[in-house]
Curated annotation (Swiss-Prot):
The lineage of its organism: Bacteria, Pseudomonadati, Pseudomonadota, Gammaproteobacteria, Pseudomonadales. GO terms for cellular component: cytosolic small ribosomal subunit. Signal peptide: none annotated. Keywords: Ribonucleoprotein, Ribosomal protein, RNA-binding, rRNA-binding. Binds the lower part of the 30S subunit head. Binds mRNA in the 70S ribosome, positioning it for translation. HAMAP family: Ribosomal_uS3_B (MF_01309_B). It comes from Pseudomonas fluorescens (strain ATCC BAA-477 / NRRL B-23932 / Pf-5). This is Small ribosomal subunit protein uS3. Belongs to the universal ribosomal protein uS3 family. Gene3D superfamilies: 3.30.300.20, Ribosomal protein S3, C-terminal domain. Part of the 30S ribosomal subunit. Forms a tight complex with proteins S10 and S14. InterPro entries: KH_dom, KH_dom-like_a/b, KH_dom_type_2, KH_sf_prok-type, Ribosomal_S3_C_sf, Ribosomal_uS3_bac-typ, Ribosomal_uS3_C, Ribosomal_uS3_CS.
Length: 228
C-alpha cells in the first residue's frame, strides 16, 4: 500500500514555517519541547470555544512570545482584556519566563484546515449526515476562493457496524508539488458510536518566488443552454 508523507512536514522551510521557533542545546531541548506541548494542550483546553487554529511559540532571550491564531479573537481577549491577561499570568507561571501573547484573527475560517475539520467534527457530533457536512464545507471553501479541497472521514459512519472511510473532493489538491500551499489538519469527532476521524486538505495556490498567487473566488460554471 502507498504511504503518504505529512503534507506540512515535507513543506517546512519551503512554503511552511515551524510553529515552534527557538534554539536549545542537548540538555534543554527535551524540556523546551515538553513545555511547548503542555502550553498547546493547556490553551486548546482553555479556548475550546474560540475556534483556535494554530499556536506559534517563539523564545527570544529568556522570554516567550505566543501567537494565537483564532477566528473569534473577542472570546480569547475577554471583557477589557481580562481573559488574555489571566492566560498570560498562568503561562508565565507555567513556563517560568515572562510571556507575551499576540492574537491573530483568521479572516477566512472557511480556508483554514483546522477550523474546517473542527466544524465537520462538531456537525458529526450533532448527528448531521456526514455527506451533508462534507459537501457544505467543500462548497464554502470553493466559494471563498480555494483552488481545491479534500475532506475524508473514517469510522462508524452513520452508526454502521463496520467502520469505513469516505471522502469528497473538489478542484485540485497536488500533494506532490512542493511549492503548493496546502493546509492539512486532522480532528476527532466523539460520537455515541465511537470516534470518527476527520482529515482536511485545502489547496490555496502555488508560492512562486516567495509570493503566493492571489486567491480569487471561483467563477460559477456557465450554464448549458437547453436544446430546442
Amino acid at each position: 500500500m502507498g504511504q503518504k508523507v505529512h503534507p506540512i512536514g515535507i513543506r517546512l522551510g519551503i512554503v511552511k514555517e515551524h510553529t515552534s521557533v527557538w534554539y536549545a542545546d542537548g540538555r534543554t531541548y527535551a524540556d523546551y519541547l515538553l513545555a511547548d506541548l503542555n502550553v498547546r494542550e493547556y490553551l486548546q483546553d482553555k479556548l475550546k470555544s474560540a475556534s483556535v487554529s494554530r499556536i506559534d511559540i517563539h523564545r527570544p532571550a529568556q522570554t516567550a512570545r505566543i501567537t494565537i491564531h483564532t477566528a473569534r479573537p473577542g472570546i480569547v481577549i475577554g471583557k477589557k482584556g481580562e481573559d488574555v491577561e489571566k492566560l498570560r499570568q498562568d503561562l508565565t507561571k507555567q513556563m517560568g519566563v515572562p510571556v507575551h501573547i499576540n492574537i491573530e484573527e483568521i479572516r477566512k475560517p472557511e480556508l483554514d484546515g483546522m477550523l474546517v475539520a473542527q466544524s465537520v467534527a462538531q456537525q458529526l457530533e450533532r448527528r448531521v449526515m456526514f455527506r451533508r457536512a462534507m459537501k457544505r464545507a467543500v462548497q464554502n471553501a470553493m466559494r471563498i476562493g480555494a483552488k481545491g479541497i479534500k475532506i475524508q472521514v473514517s469510522g462508524r459512519l452513520g452508526g454502521a457496524e463496520i467502520a469505513r472511510t469516505e471522502w469528497y473532493r473538489e478542484g485540485r489538491v497536488p500533494l506532490h508539488t512542493l511549492r503548493a500551499d496546502i493546509d492539512y489538519a486532522t480532528y476527532e469527532a466523539h460520537t455515541t458510536y465511537g470516534v470518527i476521524g476527520v482529515k482536511v486538505w485545502i489547496f490555496k495556490g502555488e508560492v512562486i518566488g516567495g509570493r503566493q498567487e492571489e486567491l480569487k473566488p471561483q467563477a460559477p460554471a456557465p450554464r448549458k443552454k437547453a436544446a430546442k
